[in-house]
């Protein structure tokens, strides 16, 4: 897996555009079953069109930078574990964006247009059902659909991954672990530890 650590807005010089890039964006804390549904779909889509997968993630976590519940925020996986899980799934390229307050002010449309399209030129962007991005989390699937027709890429939304009628999410796994309910966290995902 190729790993890039770009300054916000610019890809590092070692990242080379790939043909038929299948892209996703997110923090991917825990790389849980819901994330895996997105990532595995990407891997399959890339194989079908002889492309490569590109995951764009952020470090530090946006909540740490924006001070949203950051004092009690505990992560399911650290950065190294996340990278290992992404590599095991078969992701070809990982871009870790340095998340700063300045970067948090980039509008969702500008992020997709000036960063993702300009630097990666995706064939398709795949996101989860509840994914939001850009300033104040204003970007969503609807915006991606609008931009897709304008910039000629495909967009796909992966629906919630449910376990016993509960949509799997990093937040739900974290809350289970904070309560000491490792069994519930494991039900939502693979083995967790406290």
Describe the predicted segments one by one.
Residues 2-194:
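Nucleotidyltransferase catalytic core that binds NTPs
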């Amino acid at each position: 897996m190729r790993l890039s650590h770009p300054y916000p807005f610019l890809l590092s010089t070692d990242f080379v555009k790939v043909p038929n890039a299948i892209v996703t964006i997110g923090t991917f804390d825990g790389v849980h079953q819901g994330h895996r549904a997105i990532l595995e779909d990407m891997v399959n889509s890339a194989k079908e069109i002889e492309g490569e997968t590109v995951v764009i993630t952020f470090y530090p976590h946006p909540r740490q930078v924006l001070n949203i519940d950051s004092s009690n925020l505990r992560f399911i996986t650290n950065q190294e574990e996340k990278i290992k899980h992404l590599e095991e799934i078969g992701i070809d390229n990982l871009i870790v964006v340095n998340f700063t307050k300045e970067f948090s002010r980039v509008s969702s449309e500008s992020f997709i247009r000036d960063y993702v399209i300009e630097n990666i030129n995706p064939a398709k962007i795949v996101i989860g059902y509840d994914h939001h991005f850009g300033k104040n989390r204003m970007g969503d699937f609807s915006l991606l659909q609008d931009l897709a027709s304008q910039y000629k890429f495909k967009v796909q939304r992966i629906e919630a991954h449910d376990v016993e009628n509960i949509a799997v999410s990093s937040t739900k796994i974290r809350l289970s672990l904070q309560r000491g309910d490792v069994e519930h966290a494991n039900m939502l995902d693979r083995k967790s530890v406290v």
